[in-house]
Design a protein with these regions (language model features):
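Coil residues (strongly favoring Ser/Thr
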Residues: 46-47, 64, 105, 121
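Short loop/turn microsegments at loop-to-beta-strand junctions
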Residues: 52-53, 75, 172-174
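Thiol-based oxidoreductase modules, predominantly thioredoxin-like and allied folds used
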Residues: 107-121, 137-149
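Short, internal strand/loop/helix patches
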Residues: 126-172
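Thiol-/selenol-based redox modules, centered on thioredoxin-like
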Residues: 163-212
């Protein structure tokens, strides 16, 4: 099994506050940097937050998927592999609750990256999706180059480890909530039903949040 560990030291960049309509605002997670620029002749400092980089993958239908396909969407990401005998089935069962809650909602996606692309071919991913009852384009199972996926995982504040000396894969599963600007807004234990309920509630909060 492959180890997925949410990186220690996630930086909380935005304290929870309130909208004018008294709705909770989710924090922005990850690194940030200050950028100085001139606007209307005035020097101002802006904050640039960590975002998910450009991607290029293939989904379970054989369609090419890149970051442009996620533009303007709130989405949840996770990492898995189809032969995982332990927590992946629990994660995917819990992700089905998220899928069923939002499958008819516009502006929402789920992206699940396989960390074993050698085994998880497109036909394998399609059979896996069919077994889960996934249809349509709300939830994509994505296959790409392993090294690229490992780098992408880091951008989600998740680390991926290779096989251990015994030849086994080990992984912890987390669901990562991304906003329309591709910023990280929450991390959730995908094996914990209470955490998944919180994720569903936070998606609703994020959908109500104005894009600034």
């Amino acid at each position: 099994m492959k180890k997925l560990v949410v990186a220690i030291g996630i930086v909380l960049l935005w304290n929870a506050c309130k909208f004018n309509n008294n709705e909770k605002v989710l924090p922005i997670l990850g690194s940030r940097r200050a950028v100085t620029k001139v606007v209307n002749g005035q020097t101002v400092t802006d904050t640039v937050y960590q975002t998910i980089p450009a991607i290029k993958y293939i989904n379970q239908y054989g369609d090419s998927i890149n970051d442009k396909n996620l533009d303007g969407n709130i989405y949840v990401a996770d990492f898995f592999f189809t032969t995982c005998p332990s927590i992946c089935p629990i994660m995917q069962r819990n992700m089905l609750n998220v899928y069923n809650a939002f499958k008819d909602s516009t502006g929402f996606k789920i992206v699940s990256y396989t960390i074993d692309p050698q085994h998880d071919s497109i036909p394998v991913l399609k059979r896996y999706a069919d077994k889960l009852g996934i249809n349509g384009n709300t939830w994509w199972l994505l296959q790409g180059h392993k090294d690229e996926t490992y780098q992408v995982a880091k951008s989600y504040l998740v680390s991926v480890q290779e096989k251990n000396p015994a030849g086994e894969y080990i992984h912890d599963g987390y669901f990562i909530l991304i906003d329309k600007k591709k910023r990280i807004r929450g991390t959730y234990d995908g094996t914990n039903p209470d955490e998944v309920k919180k994720l569903i509630a936070d998606i609703k909060i994020l959908k109500a949040e104005p894009v600034i």
